[in-house]
Regions:
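Elongated, non-catalytic scaffold/linker segments and compositionally distinctive motifs
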Residues: 1-2, 40
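N-terminal single-pass transmembrane signal-anchor helix
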Residues: 2-35
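N-terminal pilin/flagellin-like segments and related low-complexity appendage regions
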Residues: 28-338
Length: 338
């Protein structure tokens, strides 16, 4: 008995249908995988954005610390304590190795609210926060660009703070919880050493803040405060301090403040308050806040007078040079990063 042969045309149609079926299946699989990858990438992007926003808020808080807490506060360069009890507020004071969740907000002495991060606020997936011993605001430590960070990320030291966003729950973790080990894996759940990449062990996303990153805007704020004091000196004396000693006295109020300017003013009948003679130079001028000397900024400030109304200041541990000009509120700088 002869069986009917399938013609070449029919064979081609059959093969085309099989290929189409396989292609459709593989395309569907590819779309599922691609969609999953897109979802994962979108989630990672949101997490990275949240970490960067929280980092920016902490750095801005550190830069403006002297303005937020007054002249006798810890001063610029300090960071808030973590939230250790889960109420979304910082818990002070914090001891060495401070570690907890990042505060959602900070209540200032004025009762105003400083927002830090509302990422996953009200849930157990908030960002975790490690704070270097040397940059705590309460109790205050001496903070300036020469002070090293005590935290390490991926084998590199010098971090002032580390932010960690937890991933999905893994085997052995129990949530909700107030224990770091239920959210963070390996060395990331406490201590001073952190890892940012090791998919085989954990799914945390890590963002460190280096001392240089923290101190770049902080030094700019300190330079602005120095500029205000030197402007006050210039208004009374008609020039910037000529020597290092004059510079230090101008900033701290030592040496009678203005020096010889008082005598000149007195000769004109005390028109500018100069009747007080050489001791006051027309009366006391502005001086730097207490935090300036408390944090050793004076000892680490390099002053260079260029001419009567122009000078530069720089700070040990930071390679930015700031140029101050009398009567000019803006300050030129050689770089944006230490």
């Amino acid at each position: 008995m002869k069986y009917p042969r399938i013609g070449f045309h029919q064979q081609g149609v059959l093969l085309l249908l099989i290929a189409l079926f396989l292609l459709t299946g593989s395309t569907a699989l590819f779309l599922v995988v691609m969609n999953s990858n897109n979802v994962d990438q979108a989630r990672l992007d949101r997490t990275l954005d949240a970490l960067n926003e929280a980092s920016d808020a902490l750095i801005a808080y550190s830069m403006m610390y002297g303005d937020l807490y007054g002249n006798n506060g810890a001063g610029p360069g300090h960071l808030p304590c973590p939230d250790t009890d889960g109420d979304e507020l910082e818990d002070t004071p914090c001891g060495p190795g401070a570690f907890g969740r990042i505060p959602r907000e900070i209540v200032l002495p004025t009762a105003d609210i400083y927002a830090v991060s509302d990422f996953n606020s009200g849930t157990d997936q908030r960002i975790w926060y490690a704070l270097s011993n040397n940059f705590r605001a309460d109790p205050p430590a001496v903070a300036n660009p020469q002070i090293p960070g005590t935290l390490t990320v991926d084998g590199s030291g010098g971090y002032a703070a580390v932010l960690i966003a937890p991933g999905a729950v893994l085997a052995g973790q129990n949530r909700p919880s107030n224990l770091a080990a239920d959210y963070l894996e390996g060395t990331n759940n406490g201590g001073a050493v952190f890892q940012s990449v090791d998919a085989g062990i954990f799914n945390d996303v890590v963002r460190g803040i280096t001392v240089d990153e923290l101190m770049s805007p902080v030094t700019a704020r300190v330079a602005e405060k120095i500029g205000e004091v030197l402007q006050s000196f210039f208004d009374r004396r008609g020039n910037y301090p000529r020597t290092r000693l004059q510079f230090e006295n101008a900033l701290t109020g030592g040496g009678g403040g203005g020096g010889g300017g008082g005598g000149r003013g007195g000769g004109r009948g005390g028109g500018r308050g100069g009747g007080g003679g050489g001791g006051g130079g027309g009366g006391p001028g502005l001086t730097m806040p207490a935090w300036f000397t408390d944090n050793d900024w004076l000892a680490n400030t390099v002053y260079n007078r260029l001419n009567t109304n122009t000078a530069t200041v720089a700070f040990a541990g930071c390679n930015i040079v700031y140029t101050l000009n009398a009567g000019v509120t803006s300050i030129a700088k050689t770089s944006s990063q230490c």
